[in-house]
Amino acid sequence: VPDAQSQWAELLLATLAEAGIRDAIISPGSRSTPLVWAACQIPSLRRHALIDERSAGFFALGQARVTGAPSLLICTSGTAPSHYYPAVIEARQSGLPLLVLSADRPFELQDCGASQTIDQAHLFGGYARYFELGTPVAERAAVLGLQRMAWQAVAAALEAPRGAVHLNFRAKKPLEPASLITSEVTPVLRPARSGYRWRPAPPTQVSPEDLAELTERWTQSRCPLLVCGALSLQDSPSAELVARFARLSGAIVCAESVSQLRFQLDPSTADVAICDSYDWLLGSPQWSKQVAPDLVLQLGAPPLSAQLGRLLEDTPGLELWVCAETGWPDPLLQSARITRACPTELLLALCRALEARSPAVPSTAQRLWRDAGTRVRQLVDAQLGRAFGEPEAVSRICSRVPAGSLLVLGNSLPPRLVDRYCPAAARRLRVLSQRGTSGIEGLIAGALGAASQAQCPTTLLCGDISFLHDVGSLWAARSEHTHVPATGWPLVIVVINNGGGRIFDQLPMAKQAGDHQRFWTTPHALDLRGAAALYEVGYSRASDRETLRIALESAYARTDVSIVEVVVDADSARARLSAVAAEVDTYLRGVLSAS
């Protein structure tokens, strides 16, 4: 049927938009022409152009981390969609909705040496739901099927467990719509229906049996901990609810920065034990033995802190409960129970149950954790004031991130340094991280995608190797390609340049590797201003407290993308870690001997 293919594509894109798709990230190619042209006909669809599919994939995930909704990726055939694979895996592991719409060659060109043709069916294996869209047919049943698959794809991306969905569109030549050549085009494919009524399932409620048992355990515990690991903006409970639960239960709250709670909770709140120094406290063997918890409730992903991990693994008699709507976030295999519930719903139910009982009386353990945590934070701050290095740089950067803004943390050292050196504070920061697979790929692209939706200043804090790994994603910073600069808000990319991947210097292998250590740390002597010049974004360099202050003030005064390169000594993080740990251990030994 003449022009049926273009009308098929237009109907598909219109239905996806009706189902809630608001952003399309398009990578160039010929076979995807019907899809791209169709996307350009929908006024409600914001279109972004990225030449690299890997960057496009993580740009879409950055948007999803902020909005909770899937964005649409469009690409040509062949190896093009395979570059989405890392983002598709991250979507599955992080529970992020994502739609991939790949163009493909028709069936008759498969397995015969046709150019740019591979087997794209089920390309992403078990990491994505798959829909074969077939070829255009001018029949009502076929049109109904196409519209149903579009709605079903969006629903599948949003239903638990959230993740990626792959739609495969087989296009034949001519790829251009007939309307570009002649005005005499007869509509042959009309919508068979519109307005599907679909809504995601409500949050999972805790079972009465789990609630009764956990309430009983909590009231009997002498030293309960609430551990908050990585949580999305959509899944994290409010700071007010966590504080209410801590007050009612006597829980000691240990919140990682990526939980959304570390920079939302107020540590000065009366009758609430918020300990932001847990990583230092648990680094002391004596503390871990004498003031160890007997009950831990974990919200979100497993904790990033190695000290918390060792506590969960090595403490005799410790009972671990894990709250998870889907998945099995217990890599140490230590949990007594995986309770299927939304974190907010679980805490609300526990609060109601605990309110019916006698109020919790602050225990000796709770007072020790709170008082020691406060003093340890003072010791850490004093150490930071002695010399400028990576820990102090991270602390000062976080303190200057505007209140109420978005902070994107890279992987490797940055999130660990933030948790060690940045105190909890009620600054209303939203914190994004790529903790699904904990890889360094796509960090710049993800931050740019998040910034396109955030409607506030955005800061990416990452290491130099992470930056170099994704430097091509700075293409998305150009206003003619995406909507990022048009937001009018600054995106500040802060790069800690310590000359390589220094987290590997903290591993046991570093002592034996000798000259072979370069295969882990990948040292370099690059100046990052060249990258800024290539992509025409702002740039400044800092190497001490004053130049860092000036660089950040200048970057946040802009309304576009800029890079702040912070040059630090390669060994500063490891050296400061050893010095602070020794001082903290000495202090805690005194506290424990006195108690």
Residue ranges and their predicted role:
Residues 102-153, 255-372, 556, 565:
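Glycine-rich, acidic loop regions that bind phosphate or pyrophosphate groups
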Residues 4-90:
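N-terminal cofactor/phosphate-binding cores enriched in small/glycine residues
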Residues 1-4, 311-415, 543-554, 558-595:
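Phosphate/pyrophosphate-binding active-site segments
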Residues 149-152, 156-220:
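Conformationally flexible catalytic loops at phosphate/diphosphate-handling active centers
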Residues 9-20, 27-31, 35-39, 370-455:
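Active-site diphosphate/adenylate-binding microenvironment
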Residues 83, 228-320, 425-455, 468-472, ...:
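Glycine-rich, anion-gripping cofactor-binding loops and their flanking helix/strand elements
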Residues 101, 108-121, 417, 423-595:
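Thiamine diphosphate
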Residues 22-26, 46-48, 66-105, 292-300, ...:
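A short, small-residue-rich loop immediately preceding and capping a beta-strand
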